[in-house]
Structure formats: C-alpha cells, structure tokens
Amino acid sequence: MALTQRLEFRQSQSLVMTPQLMQAIKLLQLSNLDLTTFVEEELERNPLLERANDEASGGEAPAEAGQFSDSDGGHNDEPGGGPGEAFEPGQEEWMSKDLGTRAEIEQTLDTGLDNVFSEEPAEAAARNAQDAAPTTYTEWGGGASGDEDYNLEAFVAAEVTLGDHLAEQLSVAFTAPAQRMIGQYLIDLVDEAGYLPPDLGQAAERLGASQQEVEDVLAVLQKFDPPGVCARNLSECLAIQLRELDRYDPAMQALVEHLDLLAKRDIAGLRKVCGVDDEDIADMIGEIRRLNPKPGMKFGAARLQTMVPDVYVRPGPDGGWHVELNSDTLPRVLVNQTYYSELSKKIGKDGDKSYFTDALQNATWLVRALDQRARTILKVATEIVRQQDGFFTHGVAHLRPLNLKAVADAIQMHESTVSRVTANKYMATNRGTFELKYFFTASIASADGGEAHSAEAVRHHIKQLIDSEAPAAILSDDTIVERLRASGIDIARRTVAKYREAMRIPSSVQRRRDKQSALGNVLSTAMSDRSRNPEPA
C-alpha cells in the first residue's frame, strides 16, 4: 500500500464557547449584589467604561485633562483654576521659559504637577478646612452618592468577633510559643456558634504535635469566656457550662449524656437513667434549658447581606399585574466614545492601539450584555406571573405546578437559560418576597382526574390540617391522606410523611405527647393558682 500526500477541503460547523459568551452566561446567574461587584471590577479594569450618572460622561473628563497639551504651549487661559482665572504678571512667561509645558514636565516626572508642587501653607490649610467640612448628610455618613440615606453605621464601633475575643485570652493563658501556636490554630477552627470540629486528630498531625498536647491546650481553651466555647458537640458544651456553675453532678451528667431522650420528651426514660424523681428531673430540665447551646453567637460575625428583590409585582389598574425591574439593582454603564476617539488620534504604538480596541469591544459587549440580562429577567418574571396568577390573587393554595420547560417554551428560550435567570433572583409581591425558583414546583395528580396540584400547595394544605387538629384528635398520616383525597388530591402516605418531615412537623405520636404535656402543664398551673387563691365561701 503506497503512502501519498493530498489536500482535502472540508466544511464543518461546531459550537465555539467564546470568552464573551461564557461571561454572558455567567452574568445571567449572578445575583444583583454579585453583579454590582463584577461591574465595579470592570469599571476599574476598563478605561473606556464609565457610570451612566457620572458628570464627566461623554469624554468630558479626558478633555479637561488634555487642556494642557503641546499645542497649547502652556498658554491656556484656564491652567488649573476655575473659568476666568489668569496668570499673575510674568508668571505665564516663567512657566513657558523655565519649566516648559505641563505635559513635558509630567512626562519627565512620571506624575502630575499637582502631586509635586504643593500649595502655599495658608492656602492649603484653608482648602483642607473647607474640604473637610461635610455639607450634606451623605458626607457625614460616609455615603458614596447624594441619593443614599444617612449612614448611621459609620459611627458604630466595629463588633468584636469571637476569634478576637478568644485570641485576647490566649495571649494571657499561655506563655510557651508551642502552646500558643496550638491554641491559635484551634481558635481558627472555631465556627460562629463556638464549636470545634469533632475530630482534632488532623489538627495534631498538621501541627506536628501529639494528641495529648492538643487535648491539654483544648482543656484550657474550654475555660475561656464565653462558657461553653470550644466544645466539640452539644453535650460537651452543656457540660462545660454546668461545671462553670458547679452543677455537673452524676445525675446531671447522665442527663447531658442522654439528650436524645430529652429531644423525644421521654421523661420516664430520663428519670430512669438519672435516678431521680419527677420533681428533680423537671428542675434539671429547666437548668438545661437556661444554658446557651450556641455561646459564640453573641459575638460579631460576618454581616448578612440584605435580600434585595430584582423584580417588583404590583396590582395593575385594570385588574392584572404590573411587573417591573428594580432599577436600583441594575448597574448603569456607558462606553466613553469621545475618550476613545481622542485617544485614537494620539496613540502611535500598535500595542496601545490593540489594547484600546479590545477595551472598546469589551465595554460595548458589557453594555449590551447587561441590557440583554435585564430584558431576559423581565421576560421570565412576566411569564411566571402569568402562569401563577392564582397564587398572586388567592394565595399559596392556588399555586400551580410549573417547571422550567413550560416557561422556556412560552417565551421561546432554552430551558437552561431560564434556569440561570431564576437562580439567585427574588421577586417582591403583595404576599412577600420569594425566590424565582419558589414558583417552580412538582405536580401531584388530582384524585378526580382534574387539574394537577402544586407540591407547595399540598404542603400548605397539610400544614393547615395539622395546625387545626384538636389535642384529643391528632391526625395520623393515614388520616391526612384520606382528607387530602377527599379534597381531590391523590397522594401517597409516604409523600405526606416526606412533606411533613420537610416542614419539621413531628409525627402524630410526638404531637399527641407534646400537646398532652402542654395541657397537663396548663392544668397544673391552674390548680396551683387556685390553691393559692381559694374562692371565698
């Protein structure tokens, strides 16, 4: 078989994921807070991007910076002051003869003249005093723009974190560097509730210390303030606090070691393992409840971000619903075409031209991508409102089954696009603020063959049935199934149990025990009050 060389031409098509397309997909699924951060980074990175509300839009700022150019020769009537300012007699000639043009000087010094030649001391002091005086509430509060509210948080002292509080005690408790290192490592592992991981063997291995050395340091850390900190589980946390109160006797130790019985309200089992009577076990349970299961939560932690809705839904004048985007969450950026035009005339190097050409393309793409993102969110939100009109009008019981494909087909988009749009987006309605994904629920068949029911609506129905049950007639899962089927909802018992557990509703046995216990407490309190205040004969 002979080997030959030949040329072949083939035509083929393939999908290419360009960097800009990847960025566009990323923008769709960003939350409004993450989007703001992304746009801020682009504004710092791209010189041709600017905020739409900037005063120097359209290239005014670059034009002002270019007032002192070679063609001007330093003879501009407004060299750096306000309009109408002029040089003192002889000052203009001195500037041109002795120092040359401003542009030449700045190019030589690689910085601006304002950074080199300071003002006269008296003028500088007056200017600083004037600049330092805040003129608006925003300046007092440290706000970034004039339309922001007064920022009282600027005057609030920073909260002390749990790690800082423990580190202060660590420096006093240990003098040996090795123990301090172990202690600091363990403090770094403490979560915001004040707990350490259950297994510290890996910590000893990483530190090159023995398990006993780590345990010795941990024993000291567990005596730090707040009581209960640096525990590895709830039982250990409660035991530390009880030792601090000198209440960790054998009976209390048995109770702490059997918290599972306390969670089940198995009072008889607790009496047996603790070896005490009803009165003592009640007092012991009361002491346990007064302890703090999360001692670290009273210290400062990362500030939670406020949930800001992306879409508002309001009743329309014609009886429908008005859907609009939250304009406050949409970053407004523009491409400074004027600046690019001026730079194009002055740039001589090919590398610089390529840089600014790429910057222009990226800026143009970002503006279009932000606009397309806003339009897509509005389109998806509008379709969700149309599909779930019953929910907005009557409540969660009328929430319809809905999936991503139904919305995607209605607005002629891909299902993956709808999935990205609904991620991390929130809708403010007359019934509260919901994540867009909340409106997508599975369907449960109707018992009479009619319209299917939403899983969220069924969960709501189950919760209503349990909330309205009488203490003497607790509903079992089988009874709930019968009542749901009577309402036209075809559902299995295991589904009811799954929904009930997802809503953290205990079983019928536990609910009966809880309600009987609560009823017994009410009756005993009433009898006690009656014995203290007998009715007059």
Swiss-Prot record:
Pfam families (alphabetical): Sigma54_AID, Sigma54_CBD, Sigma54_DBD
Keyword check for Transcription: yes
MF annotations from Gene Ontology: DNA-binding transcription activator activity; nucleotidyltransferase activity; sigma factor activity; transcription cis-regulatory region binding
Induction data: Negatively autoregulated.
NCBIfam families: PRK05932.1-3, PRK12469.1, rpoN_sigma
Family of the protein in this entry: Belongs to the sigma-54 factor family.
Record's protein name: RNA polymerase sigma-54 factor 2
Gene that this polypeptide is encoded by: rpoN2
